[in-house]
Amino acid sequence: MAMEDQSAARSIGKVSWFSDGKGYGFITPDDGGEELFVHQSSIVSDGFRSLTLGESVEYEIALGSDGKTKAIEVTAPGGGSLNKKENSSRGSGGNCFNCGEVGHMAKDCDGGSGGKSFGGGGGRRSGGEGECYMCGDVGHFARDCRQSGGGNSGGGGGGGRPCYSCGEVGHLAKDCRGGSGGNRYGGGGGRGSGGDGCYMCGGVGHFARDCRQNGGGNVGGGGSTCYTCGGVGHIAKVCTSKIPSGGGGGGRACYECGGTGHLARDCDRRGSGSSGGGGGSNKCFICGKEGHFARECTSVA
């Protein structure tokens, strides 16, 4: 069994960082030595085991089984127990996610999200943190990000997910100022070209419900075919061509008039028996003529 080589001498230092949520922190020795790792289980306390930033503590130095030094038997100066209260050490929900200090939350932090204590500066506290969805930096969540809609601030964020509208990083599609126009995304270029096409305009980078070219029809692209006019880039409910012109393109025949490009429920001639000659392929069961059905036939059987 691996044993820890403990030193009989006790040292004094100050807490440089501690996270209640993670259960560990670091102590800077007063003699200027290297920072020491301290685990929550090594704290001698009458209450909740925690340390406060800048707090003076007394401890022993031990060599762990991993070959690294750490602080154990951490007490108040003089060997007394650290009297920690549950509400005093975690009154604001533990350490701030931005700067690591206690007493406030990340959304109220004045330290920002720079690389000094929690950012992507390669320090000991950057490795385990997730990346902000807005700017790509570490040390805070997207809801606390101060670069919410910038676009320019997150461009080099590395690791930020691309905006669904413009393909850039640093913001979400709902906050995008680039819109879904053709100048940035409509041409199919950029990193979003492999996405599904908008059902309205055929472009990529946005959904039909967010499309700004609702009735366009001239954008083309890979959209689905309109049931009314046979064109692409929009759906039948927003089509401005109620009756197809020319060779209406492969639609089913309307049950009311026999024409193509629309359904019976949308037919402009619904219920009128005078609309013969619709070009339909169905014949009236009563008179044998095309253009109407038996229920609308005016001929006496």
From Swiss-Prot:
Cellular localisation: Nucleus; Cytoplasm
Subunit details: Interacts with PTAC16, PABN1, PABN2 and PABN3.
Modified residues (N-acetylalanine): 2
Tissue: Mostly expressed in shoot and root apices, and siliques, and, to a lower extent, in roots, cotyledons, stems, shoots, leaves, floral buds and flowers.
SMART domains documented for this protein: CSP, ZnF_C2HC
GO molecular function: DNA binding; mRNA binding; zinc ion binding
Subcellular location, principal: nucleus
Function: Chaperone that binds to RNA, single- (ssDNA) and double-stranded (dsDNA) DNA, and unwinds nucleic acid duplex. Promotes freezing tolerance.
Disrupted gene: phenotype observed: Sensitive to freezing.
Single biological process term from Gene Ontology: unidimensional cell growth
Positions of the CSD domain: 13-76
Keywords, sorted A to Z: Acetylation, Chaperone, Cytoplasm, DNA-binding, Metal-binding, Nucleus, Repeat, RNA-binding, Zinc, Zinc-finger
Family of this protein: Belongs to the cold shock protein (CSP) family.
Organism whose genome encodes this protein: Arabidopsis thaliana (Mouse-ear cress)
Any GO CC annotation of this UniProt entry: mitochondrion
InterPro entries cross-referenced by the UniProt entry: CSD (IPR011129), CSD_CS (IPR019844), CSP_DNA-bd (IPR002059), NA-bd_OB-fold (IPR012340), Znf_CCHC (IPR001878), Znf_CCHC_sf (IPR036875)
Reported induction: Accumulates during cold acclimation, especially in roots.
Mapped zinc finger ranges (CCHC-type): 94-111, 130-147, 161-178, 196-213, 224-241, 252-269, 282-299
Protein name: Cold shock domain-containing protein 3
